[in-house]
Each structure stands twice: as structure tokens, then as C-alpha cells.
Regions:
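Short, intrinsically disordered C-terminal tails of secreted or membrane-associated proteins
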Residues: 218-224
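N-terminal membrane-targeting hydrophobic helices
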Residues: 1-195, 200
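Accessible peptide chain termini
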Residues: 1, 224-225
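Basic polycationic patches enriched in arginine
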Residues: 196, 201-202, 208, 224
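Short, low-complexity intrinsically disordered segments enriched in small and basic residues
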Residues: 203, 215-216
Length: 225
């Protein structure tokens, strides 16, 4: 699937747990990490008409879609995270969500499936493929991406943070403000009990919910709206 789809998948998945902004970003990026092996397409395209073309994409694509790199990604997540064990485990699961999505719909326009060499570099015996895998640009992938984008915007409206927080807290606040002005709710205007979340945002209600396990009255507002 598209890296955009993988990114949105990682973000939505990261919101299934109570994580600090840094850890949310780590879990989200873990869902995109396998596609680092796709960066070889840049030198391949730049050198395709030269006397010595670099076939880095053709040769190495999916070389990081492996259990070994999943463990490396989880290890890096563990080291960088503030909530280490939780973030490391979620990063490992987020990585595997990427593999699952590729099995669903990553077939090329020529009909070729990119097998996932899950056990490399230790073994080449297991090559993951799926009969009926749809093309990379097929309508199910588009629908999945649109649904994930909708959930991402809903999370921003509901909780007060979006993937934009990874690069700018100010831009994140502006997005949330715009969403809440466009789709107002009285809870955002008439606050109940006010507390402070671990990531510095104001919380309305007595308990912060997760996407997977929602609870009544859990609403996040940015510090300034």
C-alpha cells in the first residue's frame, strides 16, 4: 500500500493506547519503517539511462520487510521512547500492520506480487504472498486511505492532536481550532472538570479515553484555542 496509508494506519493504531506525543510519533513511524527499502527507487531512476544503472529498488525492494528489521525497529523505539516497553511493543505491532496491509494490496500493475521475505537474512524459505492481492492503486486501497484520513481528522477534533504535532504544535492547534469551529460541540464550549494531560493539554472530563477503548466524558482540548 501507499506510504501515506501506512502512515495513517500507524497514527490511528498509536491512538489505541495512552501515549505521550514522542511515543505516538515513534509508533506511527514504525508503521512506515519497512518502506525505507523503497528509497532505492531514487538512485535507480536517476541512473537508469547511464552505463552503470543502480538497480537498488529492483534488487532490494522489500528487503526490510522482515522479522529481523521489525525487531530492530522495536529496539530503536524502546531506546528512544519515554514509555519504553509499551512503545516498543506497539512499534513491533505497528510494523507488522504494514506487512499485513502489503499482503492485502501491494500488487504491481504488471500483476507481480512483491513477496515478503519474512525470515531473511536467516532463511529464504518463507516468502509471504496472498492469492487475490489487489493492485497498489485499486479502489480498496483508496477507500482504506480515505477512512483512515477521516478517523485521523476525527481524532484531531475529538482529542486535540493530529500527526501535525510531530512537526509543529502551533500548526496542530490551528488545525484543531479550524475543525472545532467548523464542527462545534457544546462540550468544547461548556467545560466540566478541567485537568492536565501528560502531554500538556487540557482535558475535559474525568478520564481520557483511547480510540480502541473509549470512555464517556473524555475530551481533549489544546492549551489554546
Amino acid at each position: 500500500m501507499s506510504p501515506v496509508t501506512h502512515f495513517l494506519t500507524g497514527w490511528v493504531f498509536a491512538n489505541c493506547a495512552k501515549l505521550k506525543p514522542r511515543d505516538r510519533a515513534i509508533v506511527t513511524l514504525a508503521s512506515v519503517a519497512p518502506d525505507l527499502d523503497g528509497l532505492g527507487i531514487i538512485p535507480e531512476l536517476l541512473t537508469r539511462n547511464s552505463s552503470h544503472p543502480l538497480l537498488w529498488f529492483s534488487v532490494y525492494h522489500h528487503s526490510l520487510h522482515t522479522l529481523a528489521f521489525a525487531l530492530v525497529t522495536a529496539g530503536v523505539a524502546f531506546v528512544l521512547a519515554t514509555q519504553r516497553w509499551k512503545t516498543g511493543l506497539l512499534a513491533l505491532l505497528s510494523f507488522h500492520l504494514h506487512l499485513a496491509e502489503d499482503l492485502l494490496g501491494a500488487r504491481g500493475p504488471d500483476g507481480y506480487q512483491w513477496p515478503i521475505p519474512y525470515l531473511k537474512p536467516f532463511s529464504s524459505t518463507l516468502q509471504l504472498t496472498r492469492q487475490g492481492q489487489w493492485q497498489w492503486n485499486a479502489w480498496p486501497n483508496i477507500v482504506i486511505t480515505v477512512v483512515l484520513l477521516g478517523i485521523t481528522l476525527w481524532l484531531a477534533w475529538r482529542r486535540g492532536f493530529s500527526p501535525i504535532e510531530m512537526i509543529s504544535a502551533k500548526l496542530n492547534r490551528e488545525l484543531v481550532t479550524a475543525l472545532r469551529r467548523r464542527f462545534p460541540r457544546k462540550e468544547f464550549l461548556n467545560s466540566g472538570s478541567v485537568g492536565t494531560s501528560l502531554d500538556g493539554r487540557r482535558i475535559l472530563g474525568t478520564h481520557r479515553s483511547s480510540l480502541c477503548f473509549p470512555s464517556a466524558g473524555a475530551l481533549l482540548l489544546p492549551a489554546r484555542i
